[in-house]
Curated annotation (Swiss-Prot):
Enzyme class: lyase
Entry binding sites for substrate: 105-106, 269, 274-275
UniProt cross-references to PANTHER family, sorted A to Z: TRANS-3-HYDROXY-L-PROLINE DEHYDRATASE
Task performed by this protein: Catalyzes the dehydration of trans-3-hydroxy-L-proline to delta-1-pyrroline-2-carboxylate (Pyr2C).
Subunit: Homodimer.
Organism for this UniProt entry: Pongo abelii
Active-site residues annotated for this sequence: 104 (proton acceptor)
Key word Lyase present: yes
Pfam families found in the cross-reference section: Pro_racemase
Recorded family membership: Belongs to the proline racemase family.
Protein's gene: L3HYPDH
The protein's name in its UniProt record: Trans-L-3-hydroxyproline dehydratase
Entry keyword set: Lyase
Catalysis performed (reactions): trans-3-hydroxy-L-proline = 1-pyrroline-2-carboxylate + H2O
EC number annotated for this UniProt entry: 4.2.1.77
Amino acid sequence: MESALALPRLPPHDPGTPVLSVVDMHTGGEPLRIVLAGCPEVSGPTLLAKRRYMRQHLDHVRRRLMFEPRGHRDMYGAVLVPSELPDAHLGVLFLHNEGYSSMCGHAVLALGRFALDFGLVPATPAGTREARVNIHCPCGLVTAFVACEDGRSHGPVRFHSVPAFVLATDLMVDVPGHGKVVVDIAYGGAFYAFVTAEKLGLDICSAKTRDLVDAASAVTKAVKAQFKINHPDSEDLAFLYGTILTDGKDAYTKEPTTNICVFADEQVDRSPTGSGVIARIALQYHKGLLELNQTRAFKSSATGSVFTGKAVREAKCGDFKAVIVEVSGQAHYTGTASFIVEDDDPLRDGFLLK
């Protein structure tokens, strides 16, 4: 017999106490906390301006929701904002333990479901099997295609990326503790360094997570110190987000290739990393290892979850040859929550432990 305790909607608190309401989801094990209410208005004429405004004026919201005691070191979040693009159904700012990302594929897969289920897109006609959701991310407009039935999300989601391109290949980077390491850098809405884990003395499938994190973080720091990242469209996008360690299986095969992404402040992605899949597909296509519309499966070494990806057409990003990549995966709801922030709480803005 289940026990039940009658509780008020929220614990007793002062009427002026801030309340942050969220929906929690995950995609392949990677969390997404979507803010429904409680975040003050994010000002700015463009999405990138809103991102700067939130970083400068509302960062306490990020810390309260991402950090302990309400979150944890590897929590990920999304604040929905209006977009200046006429075709966008919604704009989104991505939150993590260090700040604000420019792109997040696992979040786009989850937000596709969320947008349909919460009425952020027009109702789909009877018999529609797939709904289209245009999501304005800081890197640009991406289009999600949400499997649906009777107007509700049902099953996997796929999306088409912004133009993805390769910034550098076979870059020799001096990584402390590892010597000279060959690194590729590619962009999938965010810039990543790619290294075969074996080159760092690690087995991507059996190594301890801590060892993978330490190695990836060392690569990220070394690349940031020795190589300048540039983006043809905006300086706001010109930063290295993290390092993805791979099993080195870049040539086309129907078997999954395994990787793990360490981004921001040593945050570990539980999923195969949607924007990382985009960048890795762009890298494989650039090297002639993959043709258009050849689907590859990407497996997370953290959870075993799988995304699929394929380059669907060629494009340009500034002077860079690029591709549009389709990524597919499945997101799930995990719950809802309302968090309060009491003025006399010395830890009200959160904390992190390493």
